[in-house]
Regions:
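Short acidic-hydrophobic, aromatic-tinged amphipathic segments that line or gate anion-handling sites
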Residues: 95-103
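N-terminal secretory signal peptides
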Residues: 1-2
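N-terminal export signals
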Residues: 6-24
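Contiguous beta-strand/loop segments that form the cofactor/metal-binding neighborhood of enzyme cores
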Residues: 214, 224-351, 358-378, 387-391, ...
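N-terminal Rossmann-like NAD(P) cofactor-binding module of classical short-chain dehydrogenase/reductase
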Residues: 117
């Protein structure tokens, strides 16, 4: 039992500690410092989506969540009309620096941040003959790595979307992270957004065939669709084993390939059964449609494309880009031992809130707090390489290409990382 004298001694000590500015409880957690390296920061740019979530927070598990970290520095490569970078800096008290090195060192001579967010998406950049936007992700990443090397310290890095449009450059980025020992999280929000239904394949399941339906432009939206498909098929027996060959075909050849069985009409039916945004006759009189089987797709999809991926372990996966047929992204696969395909919709909430960005912000925050990326950068690496080689197939007359460069194997995370309702 606590005596009065002992109680008074404890109380007096506590009061003295408080008077001296000390804490008698556990020390306050030190807030992490973030540097953002961006192509642009304006309304609806990716830098705005992710940057704002670290500045003002985001919804998580029924509450408004404020990350226990601060944006302290920013570098923006371009400042077009509508630029928000300086306004955000003024409002939230961080500095916009003229170079990447200064942003990482906060104007000093040593690395002064605990993590780097590399968000090089959107902006005015040229395209090459394959239609790839030449975003300087690799070049900016290299500047970050050079600071790590010069200052003798490396911190976690998030890279938004592709690692690079060039497979060789993308490989160097992953190699640098392993050489210097810093966690690298890369990719888009598709693997972590909501799924309807909330399906996650069991690890080491046997997938017989997979098909993804995507929409949008190249090389932004086909990347999204390929990555969404990859996060599903990587959970098969043995994990990802690499890609043996790819081929991209277009136009009527896509429908002919379906008739010949190169892609599964049954899987297309299963995928489209999850779509919330069917086009064609549905827009005219609201009728339900079996677009996989009613013969309408060739009439309403003017420029179809099929991306065929032959994995090293024999799995065949296919992306169908069906602009004009649907306006959302769905997936289906046939698992061994299951009588029917499993299928789902990757749910993307609308602009301007694009809440799916919060799902990825949570994973970025997790990496910064734990020092470990929640899923491997090799997923983004292999998807970057698949897209690069599919677009090479396109410019080479849609021929099949062997891909020894894509013998990239990895194991998926054991846990499930997508948002759930």
């Amino acid at each position: 039992m606590l005596s009065r004298r002992t109680f008074l001694e404890i109380a007096a000590a506590s009061g003295l500690a408080a008077h001296l500015g000390c804490s008698v409880g556990p020390p306050a957690k030190k807030r992490k410092k973030l540097a953002i390296i961006a192509s642009i920061w304006k309304y609806l740019s990716h830098a705005q989506h992710f940057g704002d979530r670290f500045l003002v927070g985001y919804p998580r598990k029924g509450r408004w969540h404020h990350p226990e970290m601060d944006v302290v520095s920013l570098y923006v490569h371009q400042k077009p009309e509508g630029d928000q970078s300086q306004a955000r800096a003024d409002e939230f008290g961080f500095q916009v620096y003229p170079t990447i090195r200064e942003a990482l060192r906060c104007g000093g001579d040593k690395l002064a941040v605990d993590a780097v967010l590399l968000i090089i998406e959107h902006g005015d950049y040229p395209r090459n003959a394959k239609g790839q936007v030449l975003y300087p992700r690799y070049e900016f990443f290299r500047q970050v790595v050079e600071v790590f090397e010069q200052d003798g310290r490396a911190v976690p890095v998030f890279n938004d979307k592709h690692l690079s449009y060039d497979t060789a450059k993308a490989k160097k980025m992953v190699a640098d992270s392993k050489r210097l020992g810093f966690p690298l999280l890369a990719g888009s929000s598709l693997p972590v957004t909501w799924r309807i239904p909330a399906i996650e394949f069991p690890l080491d399941c046997v997938i017989e065939e997979a098909l993804m339906v995507g929409v949008g432009s190249s090389d932004a939206s086909d990347y999204h669709a390929l990555e969404a498909m990859q996060c599903m098929v990587e959970r098969r027996r043995g994990g990802e084993s690499g890609v043996k060959s790819v081929q991209l075909i277009q136009g009527d050849a896509v429908w002919k390939a379906g008739e010949e069985g190169r892609w599964s009409k049954r899987l297309l039916e299963a995928a489209l059964s999850r779509s919330n945004k069917l086009l064609g006759d549905t827009l005219i009189d609201a009728r339900p449609q079996d677009l996989a089987n009613n013969g309408q797709l060739p009439k309403i999809v003017k420029e179809p494309a099929a991306y065929f991926i032959e994995h090293a372990d024999g799995l065949q996966s296919t992306l169908l880009m069906l602009n004009g047929g649907v306006q959302d992204r769905t997936f289906a696969a046939k698992l061994q031992g299951e009588p029917e395909p499993q299928s789902l919709l990757f749910q993307l909430p609308p602009i301007p809130n694009v809440t799916y960005s919060a799902c990825l912000a949570e994973k970025i925050e997790e990496m910064i707090e734990t020092g470990e990326a929640p899923f491997p950068a090799e997923r983004t690496l292999i998807v970057s390489g698949i897209l690069d080689h599919c677009l090479e197939s396109k410019v080479q007359g849609n021929r099949k290409l062997e891909t020894p460069e894509l013998q990239i194997s990895y194991r998926p995370p054991e846990g499930s990382h997508f948002c759930r309702a």
